[in-house]
Amino acid sequence: MMKIAAKCCRIVMAFMAWTCAGAVGAQPLQFEPPPTPAAGRSAIPARPMASADLLAELRKGGYIIYFRHTSTDFSRDDSRSKSDDDCDNQRPLTDKGRAEAREIGAAFRDLKIPLVQVLASPRCRTMETAMLAFGKAEKSSEARAGPASPGNEDRYAPLRAVLSTPVKTGGNVAIASHGNPFIAVAGAPYLAEGEAAVIRPLGKDFEIVARVKHDGWRALARTN
């Protein structure tokens, strides 16, 4: 009987240890699950552009630079927001995010990367990112936030059209938006906060030539 009891005890202890290990190893989701790319499509793959070539190309113009807004306070969300201008009930930028946006703008000025237009999702965090970085922003309904839910995969068709349209003048277009719209039209991986995708419009589609973290812009000059 004692042997049976000891064996049962070992089994119970092993089960408890396995359960606890699973609980310790579990990690909470930090971001909302990204949607499936609209209509099963993603951007045309392109060979990554070398940093020196990227800076030279951006100085010539003709690219769209799609930013995800900089760092935000994830303890708040947009669930009670009544409108795009209802900033008190939306997830805001943190002080770190504001500093990141200013640094992005300073890097663009120092690197002499020309912008002919700055668009932004109407949400407060994206408008603030654009304003702090570049001093201007036009509200763009095409860059609005929200998932592409099943049966509504064409929600971001207007954004795909914007990213596919060639830039006509001698500069680049910056867009401050969100993670979900980008992954819906371009596919994985998800953009980090403050990260940008450099896009070459192709008329009927587009290709991504580079991804740059919020603190990676000045590195382009060091390789030029």
Annotate each PLM feature:
Residues 2-15, 19:
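Bacterial N-terminal signal peptides that target proteins for export
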Residues 18-26:
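C-terminal segment of classical bacterial N-terminal signal peptides
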Residues 29-141, 146-150, 188-198, 202-207, ...:
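Active-site-proximal alpha-helix that buttresses catalytic centers in soluble enzyme cores
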Residues 62-64, 171-177:
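Generic beta-sheet signal
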Residues 143-152, 156-164:
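All-alpha RGS (Regulator of G-protein Signaling) helical domain and cognate RGS-like helical scaffolds
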Residues 158-169, 218-224:
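A polyampholytic, Gly/Pro-enriched intrinsically disordered region
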Residues 165-171, 201-204:
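A short, structured loop/turn motif at beta-sheet edges
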